[in-house]
From Swiss-Prot:
Cofactor note: Binds 1 divalent metal cation per subunit.
One Gene Ontology term of the molecular function aspect: metal ion binding
Protein name as annotated: 2-C-methyl-D-erythritol 2,4-cyclodiphosphate synthase
Binding site for 4-CDP-2-C-methyl-D-erythritol 2-phosphate: 8-10, 34-35, 56-58, 61-65, 100-106, 132-135, 139, 142
Annotated function: Involved in the biosynthesis of isopentenyl diphosphate (IPP) and dimethylallyl diphosphate (DMAPP), two major building blocks of isoprenoid compounds. Catalyzes the conversion of 4-diphosphocytidyl-2-C-methyl-D-erythritol 2-phosphate (CDP-ME2P) to 2-C-methyl-D-erythritol 2,4-cyclodiphosphate (ME-CPP) with a corresponding release of cytidine 5-monophosphate (CMP).
Reactions accelerated catalytically: 4-CDP-2-C-methyl-D-erythritol 2-phosphate = 2-C-methyl-D-erythritol 2,4-cyclic diphosphate + CMP
Enzyme class: lyase
Record-listed a divalent metal cation binding positions: 8, 10, 42
Record has Membrane as a keyword: no
Organism name: Pseudomonas putida (strain GB-1)
Keyword Glycoprotein: no
EC number: 4.6.1.12
Gene name linked to the record: ispF
Amino acid sequence: MRIGHGYDVHRFCDGDFITLGGVRIPHKYGLLAHSDGDVLLHALSDALLGAAALGDIGKHFPDTDPQFKGADSRALLRHVVGIVRAKGWKVGNVDATIVAQAPKMAPHIETMRQLIAEDLQVELDQVNVKATTTEKLGFTGREEGIAVHSVALLLPA
């Protein structure tokens, strides 16, 4: 069994929605990114890649490569799952914590879990997503961006 940790941050920019866990959420800002900016799926991808000793998403999907401009992070996550499986691993479970002052995540978490489970090809009870604030402290508390911490457990396939 292997455990991986993922962490990602994206800064807010002009826009009127963000995408987290594959869910489009109305917001007063967007997220600045080369891809679609789905910080949750990026952190999960990094956790999976880390657990399999396969580097990180920057190695597999460099932000200097034009083919990944505006990329759908769900497609990137599915690709990560494919290469992790090719190395002989399957997902045991994943857990993620979204750190954001706004927008409120609670109304969207179940849909995020369902989409992530679909992309990972696992059962819903193998995926956990939760959210917290920093009580208005730090960059997330000042609503400058969003951060996500995640862990993944891989089991031999």
